[in-house]
Amino acid sequence: MNILDRIIETKRTEVLQLKLTGVERIDREALKPSIKQRLAGADLSVIAEIKRASPSKGAIALDVDVVAQAKQYETSGATVISVLTDETYFKGSMDDLAAVAAAVDIPVLCKDFMIDRIQIDRAKVHGARLILLIVAALEQEMLADLYAYAYAEGLEVLVEVHDEEELRRAEAIGAQIIGIN
């Protein structure tokens, strides 16, 4: 079992727990500007990332002040701030996402391993303007469903691909923002 398989298995357990406890509702002001609008006509666009740890690198910045880091990214001209919210493998949290979203005026990406609609609901109530869908982690039907659901909920989607076959899958669902990893 590779790391992506282990992460997805952990996410299945987390989703079951989320469905039992539900997603808290947080009143949010209007959504941040559209990422597509921010990318249009830009010579250079930067997605700056807040990442406490990773499975491959271990601890990176466990004690990072996410608000200070996000404000520094915004001041430096970042187009989007990506916040890792996976707790088990990346040591992030929804609290990190909410704190960053409340502190900046640019779009915030919830970077997690989305496998269920309830995770999209949770990202939205914590201030995400866009979410990440990883083609390699999803069957085509679920990829299409989560993509459509996120847009129906007023969010944008960054679809991550690793090769040409995944790019074709992303194009098949009409992905408007595609990232190559």
Describe the function of each predicted region:
Residues 1-108, 115, 140, 151-174:
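Conserved N-terminal beta1-alpha1 strand-loop-helix module at the mouth
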Residues 107, 112-114, 120, 131:
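Short acidic catalytic loops
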